[in-house]
From Swiss-Prot:
GO terms for biological process: D-galacturonate catabolic process; D-glucuronate catabolic process; pectin catabolic process. It comes from Salmonella heidelberg (strain SL476). The gene is kduI. It holds the Pfam family KduI. This is 4-deoxy-L-threo-5-hexosulose-uronate ketol-isomerase. Keywords: Isomerase, Metal-binding, Zinc.
Length: 278
């Protein structure tokens, strides 16, 4: 388990490129036949990926020991979105088939967590966010058909994008975790611009659907102290509540956002005008 500490905004603005990347960037999300796990002190979120190829992958009691409990979900909830080939997640003996861009919410108290791919040649890529939870909500699958997409932005400002809200109160109940998937229209490059912060929630982005020769310049920092991190395909970045989180790519891309914090009100944002950025 890779542990990342919280960083004060005054400290963050003094960091050089390599230190910014070390503190906020998660480079290796998917590793064949393993799970990856990054534990952030910011709202205690855990972020990672699971890619079964030649055999199934189980998250067992070894993780619980690192959290001071018996199992990962003794006091946590888990949200998973599959960005790879078809697979399945077995939760306490019950199999849930999870296709490309299907998602599964797993509530507090689940014990057995086994992840499998249907085909080794096209393995599932289960990206997950895991947050502290104090109530057990039912495990539930969410498919793209269950989500009402919202299209925002404009081609003229290069930010036309479709937002798919998977884990939000209108779709299912969670303790605090919210997750969704935003896809930029072809030829569009910007996400979340004009940008915002939200003092009451932190956020994690996973960028994917990127070609090998492309990148995203992820903008972070306080609005008057902006910095950037260069992101490649299937990399994630941690965004503290004091930081903007926006990006511009060399080509169109897709990203998964996950939030935890005080509330689940999607529009609870502190907007920042473009002319106020520095």
């Amino acid at each position: 388990m890779d542990v990342r500490q919280s960083i004060h905004s005054e400290h963050a603005k003094t960091l050089d490129t390599q230190t910014l990347r070390r503190e906020f960037l998660i480079e290796n999300i998917f590793v064949a036949d393993e799970y990856t796990m990054v534990y952030s002190h910011i709202d205690r979120i855990i972020v990672g990926g699971i890619m079964p190829v030649s055999h199934s992958v189980e998250i067992g009691g070894e993780v619980g020991k690192q959290l001071g409990v018996s199992r990962l979900l003794d006091r946590r909830e888990l949200g998973v979105i599959n960005i790879g080939g078809a697979g399945a997640i077995i939760v306490d003996g019950q199999r849930h088939d999870i296709g490309h861009r299907d998602a599964l919410y797993i509530g507090k108290g689940a014990k057995e967590l086994v992840f499998v791919s249907n085909e080794a040649s096209r393995p599932a890529k289960f990206y997950y966010n895991c947050a502290p939870a104090h109530t057990a909500y039912p495990t539930k699958k969410v498919s793209p058909a269950d989500v009402a997409p919202v299209t925002l932005g404009d081609n003229l400002t290069s930010n036309r994008r479709t937002i798919n809200k998977y884990f939000v109160p209108d779709v299912l109940e969670t303790c605090q975790l919210s997750m969704g998937l935003t896809e930029l229209a072809p030829g569009n490059l910007w996400n979340t611009m004009p940008c915002h912060t939200h003092e009451r929630r932190m956020e994690v982005y996973l960028y994917f659907n990127m070609e090998e020769d492309s990148c995203v310049f992820h903008m972070m920092g306080q609005p008057q102290e902006t910095r950037h991190i260069v992101m490649r395909n299937e990399q994630a970045v941690i965004s503290p509540s004091w930081s903007i989180h926006s990006g511009v790519g060399t080509k169109a891309y897709t990203f998964i956002w996950g939030m935890v914090g005080e509330n689940q009100v999607f529009d609870d944002m502190d907007h920042v005008a473009v002319q106020d950025l520095r």
